[in-house]
Amino acid sequence: MRKIQSVFTGKLNEKIASDCVTAIDDGTIPGAWGSENIDDEGNPQVKRVLIKNGVLQSYMIDRLNARRMHMESTGSGRRQSYKFEPTSRMSNTYIAPGKDSFEDLFAGNSKKGLYAKK
């Protein structure tokens, strides 16, 4: 966000997606690939809502960028390996299940889309 490398820069609390979109980054899911007790900067992992009902709620921010942006770290500081400094990275990011029926999802004018289920 700091270098305006994201389309979401400066859009906190703004509507950026459909009302039915809630996106979560959760580093606390037991046994999941991106889960750890702490990030690579020592911050505890949390379940973080990034987008709620289409509104941008939070960024994924490491400690250095949090300081530069005058925000708090979100526990997203991860290293690619010991050779690299921590940077903002996802843990387990997913779109939360919606409440609409299958029929309601496709009742509009959408010509293309992706439907996923467990």
Sequence positions of predicted segments:
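N-terminal small-residue-enriched
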Residues: 1-118
